[in-house]
């Protein structure tokens, strides 16, 4: 019996041991409940994590696209019409003018101007005019000459006096009183606004800008740009013009470009 009592003495739980065991059991139950709760909540947590990742990717893509747009110099409108975008890689051309080549000369003509059969001056070989306003036109005259250079005609002013038919003829020759800045008995005036003597391709040229006015004119006058040179025994003259009112409404660009582009071979 002594040995049995000893065995029971060693294995019977004490009150402290029972309390510790109950504490551990309660702790294990709490941990299991927390783990179970975590398992129940894990689908929502995984979904939130996935949404956050998707939002981050979208935000990064938006920033990338925005940066590319800011770094590009091509506007949406330009790209739509293929201007600045230059979609096909072809060099841009000036569609406002067309190159016209004649016998011994070349000139740029406004694209919206059409050929005209009207012969206004001797030796005229070309004439184009604006469809909406025939006052805006350009003509080329070629006549034989014994001069070797345009300078053989004298100064630009002296040359103009020898081809004054380019300024137009006075239709009325009766007596008039001084009115509107005109001299007595004169119904037409011509004022030289500018002259220059450029050298193009080794040839001397005269460039003369004249403003003509008539007493009954409704355009406020006409701007005449005359370009002339001598080549191979021929006098080449280009005369481009526009009414004064239209001159300042956009015609200046076309008239000046046509006159300055004229050249003889």
UniProtKB/Swiss-Prot annotation:
<dbReference type="InterPro" id="IPR016123">
    <property type="entry name" value="Mog1/PsbP_a/b/a-sand"/>
</dbReference>
<dbReference type="GO" id="GO:0015979">
    <property type="term" value="P:photosynthesis"/>
</dbReference>
<dbReference type="GO" id="GO:0019898">
    <property type="term" value="C:extrinsic component of membrane"/>
</dbReference>
<dbReference type="GO" id="GO:0009535">
    <property type="term" value="C:chloroplast thylakoid membrane"/>
</dbReference>
<feature type="region of interest" description="Disordered">
    <location>
        <begin position="11"/>
        <end position="45"/>
    </location>
</feature>
<keyword id="KW-0934">Plastid</keyword>
<feature type="compositionally biased region" description="Basic and acidic residues">
    <location>
        <begin position="27"/>
        <end position="38"/>
    </location>
</feature>
<keyword id="KW-0604">Photosystem II</keyword>
<dbReference type="Pfam" id="PF01789">
    <property type="entry name" value="PsbP"/>
</dbReference>
<keyword id="KW-0472">Membrane</keyword>
<keyword id="KW-0150">Chloroplast</keyword>
<keyword id="KW-0602">Photosynthesis</keyword>
<protein>
    <recommendedName>
        <fullName>Oxygen-evolving enhancer protein 2, chloroplastic</fullName>
    </recommendedName>
</protein>
<feature type="transit peptide" description="Chloroplast">
    <location>
        <begin position="1"/>
        <end position="69"/>
    </location>
</feature>
<dbReference type="InterPro" id="IPR002683">
    <property type="entry name" value="PsbP_C"/>
</dbReference>
<keyword id="KW-0793">Thylakoid</keyword>
<dbReference type="GO" id="GO:0005509">
    <property type="term" value="F:calcium ion binding"/>
</dbReference>
<feature type="compositionally biased region" description="Polar residues">
    <location>
        <begin position="15"/>
        <end position="26"/>
    </location>
</feature>
<keyword id="KW-0809">Transit peptide</keyword>
<comment type="similarity">
    <text>Belongs to the PsbP family.</text>
</comment>
<comment type="function">
    <text>May be involved in the regulation of photosystem II.</text>
</comment>
<dbReference type="GO" id="GO:0009654">
    <property type="term" value="C:photosystem II oxygen evolving complex"/>
</dbReference>
């Amino acid at each position: 019996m002594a040995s049995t009592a000893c065995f029971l003495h060693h294995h019977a739980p004490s009150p402290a041991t029972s309390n510790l065991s109950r504490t551990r059991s309660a702790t294990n139950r709490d941990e299991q409940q927390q783990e179970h709760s975590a398992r129940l909540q894990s689908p929502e947590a995984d979904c939130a994590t996935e949404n956050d990742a998707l939002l981050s990717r979208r935000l990064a893509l938006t920033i990338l696209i925005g940066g590319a747009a800011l770094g590009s110099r091509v506007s949406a409108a330009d790209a739509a019409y293929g201007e600045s975008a230059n979609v096909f890689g072809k060099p841009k051309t000036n569609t406002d003018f067309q190159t016209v080549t004649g016998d011994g000369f070349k000139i740029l003509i406004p694209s919206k101007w059409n050929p005209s059969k009207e012969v206004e001056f001797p030796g005229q070989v070309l004439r184009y005019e604006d469809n909406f306003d025939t006052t805006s036109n350009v003509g080329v005259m070629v006549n034989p000459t014994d001069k070797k250079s345009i300078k053989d005609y004298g100064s630009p002013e002296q040359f103009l006096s020898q081809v004054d038919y380019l300024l137009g003829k006075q239709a009325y020759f009766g007596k008039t009183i001084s009115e509107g800045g005109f001299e007595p008995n004169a119904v037409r005036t011509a004022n030289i606004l500018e002259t220059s003597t450029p050298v193009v391709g080794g040839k001397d040229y005269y460039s003369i800008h004249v403003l003509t006015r008539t007493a009954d004119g409704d355009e406020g006058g006409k701007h005449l740009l005359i370009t002339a040179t001598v080549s191979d025994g021929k006098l080449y003259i280009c005369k481009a013009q526009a009414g004064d009112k239209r001159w300042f409404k956009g015609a200046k660009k076309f008239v000046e470009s046509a006159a300055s582009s004229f050249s003889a071979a």
